[in-house]
Amino acid sequence: ALISKPETPAELKRLWYAFRDVEDGCTYTAEKLHDLKKIDALDVWRKARLAMDNNRPRAARLALNIESTELGKQAILIQADPQKYLDKRLLAITKKRKELAVLALIRVANTDPDKAAQLVDKKWGLMLTKEEHNWVWAVIGKQAAQKLQDNAHSYFNKVSRNQDLNDDLLIWKTCAALRQGDWKAVVASIDAMDGGKQDTT
């Protein structure tokens, strides 16, 4: 009865995204919402992206298990050696292969954002959708910003649509723009954030 309320699926999805560690109750609820078509494949993939970005491989695996256990197994391989995972895959044609490549690129970016940027520029960027492309560049920019790299802002500038990003990535995009004095980018990033997260003071 709870998840039949119109506002509940969105709120539960938000909570599911927010949990960095695995919560059995949240995972179970997400599975049921998926069965009821209240969350879709992109929602599941975004949860896996967030988990991989936060170095929570088990959470990524459990999220992908909602789609299929085989996808969950791929998360384990990506976590173990993302570069090897990408090297073994020449093409990413299907939606699932593209998203798995996104997870691997996120994992590479965690340790070496410049290396991840090279991989996107030389090969993988051509195979990804616009949304995937924007998310990956934002993660690369975030990791570079956390390392106080001067090129973080240039990575974020490769994002063509701020609305494809979540608030966490937009916050880091704002920080990188502030460091470079790019006020136009600062305003654009803040405007793209969820209304409840903006600080207007």
Positions of predicted regions on the chain:
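Residue-level signature for tetratricopeptide repeat
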Residues: 1-3, 50, 107, 143, ...
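Glycine-centered coil turns and helix-coil junctions that link the paired helices
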Residues: 144-147, 180
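Non-catalytic all-alpha helical scaffold/repeat segments
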Residues: 3, 11-20, 31-32, 86, ...
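Inward-facing hydrophobic residues that define packing positions of alpha-helical scaffold repeats
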Residues: 9-16, 63-64, 120-121, 153-157, ...
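Membrane-embedded hairpin module used as a gating/binding unit in multi-pass transport
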Residues: 66, 98-123
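Charged, alpha-helical scaffolding/interaction elements associated with membrane systems
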Residues: 54, 111, 179-180
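Generic helix N-cap/helix-start motif at coil->alpha-helix transitions
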Residues: 1-10, 21-28, 36-46, 54-63, ...
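Extended non-membrane alpha-helical scaffolds
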Residues: 153, 174-178, 182-189
